[in-house]
Amino acid sequence: MDKIEVRGARTHNLKNINLTIPRDKLIVITGLSGSGKSSLAFDTLYAEGQRRYVESLSAYARQFLSLMEKPDVDHIEGLSPAISIEQKSTSHNPRSTVGTVTEIHDYLRLLFARVGEPRCPNHDVPLAAQTISQMVDKVLSLPEESKMMLLAPVVKERKGEHVKLLEQIAAQGYIRARIDGEICDLSDAPKLELHKKHTIEVVVDRFKVRSDLATRLAESFETALELSGGTAVVASMDEPETEELVFSANFACPHCGYSVPELEPRLFSFNNPAGACPTCDGLGVQQYFDEKRVVQNPSISLASGAVKGWDRRNFYYYQMLTSLAKHYEFDIESPFEALPKKIQQIILNGSGKEEIEFQYMNDRGDVVVRHHAFEGILNNMARRYKETESLSVREELAKNISTCPCHDCGGSRLRQEARHVYIGTTTLPDVAEKSIGETLHFFSELHLSGQRAQIAEKILKEIKERLQFLVNVGLDYLSLSRSAETLSGGEAQRIRLASQIGAGLVGVMYVLDEPSIGLHQRDNERLLNTLLHLRNLGNTVIVVEHDEDAIMAADHIIDIGPGAGVHGGQIVAEGSAKAIMANPHSITGKFLSGVEKIEIPAKRTALDKKKMLKLEGATGNNLKSVNLAIPVGLFTCVTGVSGSGKSTLINDTLFPLAQNALNRAENTQFAPYQSISGLEFFDKVIDIDQSPIGRTPRSNPATYTGLFTPIRELFAGVPESRARGYNPGRFSFNVRGGRCEACQGDGVIKVEMHFLPDVYVPCEQCKGKRYNRETLEIRYKGKTIHQVLEMTVEEAREFFDAIPQIARKLQTLMDVGLSYIRLGQSSTTLSGGEAQRVKLATELSKRDTGKTLYVLDEPTTGLHFADIKQLLTVLHRLRDQGNTIVVIEHNLDVIKTADWIIDLGPEGGNGGGQIIATGTPEQVAEVKGSHTARFLKTLLQKR
């Protein structure tokens, strides 16, 4: 069978579509945001492919797997087992790293366990057990006639007089010993000091090196090893300064006896007690109460609240500090920063063993005197955090916690034994810290010899293949030790894509969601080659994508539309790129052929050099002391290849700093920097990202934008409502009163099914309307509150035309292209792009001061060319009101319309972290050595 037949698909907004998809091809599904692409790809094709596979398993196995809901479709034929690679499922497990997710770490563990060489951490000598024959050969290789002695170390750096031991050695017939470096006669041994450390080595044999000594030496070594427990030393008698030969028959350091168990792969796993650093349990970081967070306001006194919860208002702790101030003679009313450093340390870390007289007043007003040490504010918080069972106390205390790399393993997560196993001069933590590109180069250049080369051959092949796949999807700048929870959606998705190629499956249907997200134009070609490679293996690759290169490279394109939401869900065009461009009804085709396009502004807004937001000396992650200058009142684009430092600079440094200063956010963590100036030009900073607007089915666009409040007030103002005494709360489905209590205002009831997915059935009482009968009797202009929530934004705009407060908010939702969503649509069903535009609309509808700093990270995710055009209109409108827009973006259509560009690079990871170009798009396009400039120049020449 060479095709997938879909008949009568009605999932979400799909309008009973029929479709024939060729198998073993690269298929791109495109269309406006919200047109039904994901409904077809994920909720129909993938869901059915996965469901059929899971249903073929036993009932016992099924209970452990989440079964997909059966899509609303008449018939699908020709499906293969399906694998979906989405962006949503980034791992939040702190133990997951790029190495563990891609399984490269498993191969590295095996490699180091089989061909690694353990070394002593103190003396940096290889730990190797030598045979007696090897020891004899080594001695016989010394110059002939050299006078040597063979010693057996019996005491190493141990205190004591050792009288008994010396007597025993003499009784065994030995004549001499070297005690603390001096040769002594055992019949006249010196008296040793009891409290000093001593080293005693017995002289087992003295000889001149000659070739016929082999048998004698073998016997002497045997005796020495038995006497010392496995160690022997050969020293020169003529030249004492010559380096001594130390031999060990144990797998141990001959100098200090340090030994490791047999090397096993689990010794190199930080998720196994055998390999994890015992201090941080293999997490690589430690939590501690940070004095910078605890002393929130050092410019005021302890009494006034320098430390939250320890001021006048908390009488118990305030009494403590008063007694402490009396004992150490400092003023509790002085600013904390003015107190002597020693006093500050006592307040934070405690008085040690020094006891202090504390006076406490009990409930009856009696003064009680107690003598004890002061534990210190930081220790007090740490103790309470450990002991408390109250979630609110724990959450409050957690605000003062910071994390730092583990002081024991330095963030490598492994125990000491694993950190000192080498291949050449490199350890496993060294390999994990390198960028993937460097790691691939290291293993390509690695030459092992003999038996080790044979053992490592297959392991190295697997490692190099997997690293090459990661490089091919544009992730060469990541390191294997990078925590999986710090990856962006696009990065996590491409890692899973690389893992799938590594798996080498054939005959599978892969469904991908915009794999080009977060990828610079430079890396796009490599990504497309990867997708084509998956197809060439014999798989059907279905990609939801808006990227022009991907659409042009596809074997078959499905364009869904014509509009979004209720206006979408139909197949507008399908076939090759040429067929799509020739179709007059396809918006995608119009943009591909150039009939429609996003215009380049005729002139750029000039910048005012006196009004700049400046951030200097930013050094977070890979930033190399970056000095950033953003023009106030302009639309600035921050560009650069993946991993060049854009997110670190904007999201981890600039945004949290501005948030602290402008929004008075408490305890926001930011990356290191030197200085920031220019924040006085703003009154607030807003980050408009693609995170969901609400995590529960109860939140919806009406509640998020603030529309629902005036709508409820309208219903409460209806004469019938007033006669019944209903207030606006009556029309909320979140509180008792007007909502249906059978389903608590959800409209559906969840039925748990153990071997099947949970089923949500409409509530029998309210028939899914969320409100009780009495509330639904109130009508405004003939409509109930439920009917209003079911309206699309477009219908509601017409319905509430006479109410400016509501109409304005609805108009902004239409301006950002969301005319099709329903007011009461659950926020969990909105795509990332839709959620972001709801936030944008909410901002647009507020009374504007023209002094806002907006930060957007890749706002074009999930947006079609037509949606991007609309988004840019909105952003330019915000800019025209005097606001400053900072956008991190790879999309050239956005970059070309910016007033100002800041390009980071030149490469990702360690090869990036510098600003390599700034200026208008025309100026940046001329910069040599910038990857962005190369693509931008081509685009600007098409004007």
Curated annotation (Swiss-Prot):
A zinc finger (C4-type) spans 253-280, 740-766. This is UvrABC system protein A. The UvrABC repair system catalyzes the recognition and processing of DNA lesions. UvrA is an ATPase and a DNA-binding protein. A damage recognition complex composed of 2 UvrA and 2 UvrB subunits scans DNA for abnormalities. When the presence of a lesion has been verified by UvrB, the UvrA molecules dissociate. SUPFAM superfamilies: P-loop containing nucleoside triphosphate hydrolases. It comes from the Bacteria. Residues 310-587, 607-937 form the ABC transporter domain. InterPro entries: ABC_transporter-like_ATP-bd, ABC_transporter-like_CS, ATP_grasp_subdomain_1, P-loop_NTPase, UvrA, UvrA_DNA-bd, UvrA_inter. One of its GO terms (biological process) is nucleotide-excision repair. One of its GO terms (molecular function) is ATP binding. It holds the Pfam family UvrA_DNA-bind.
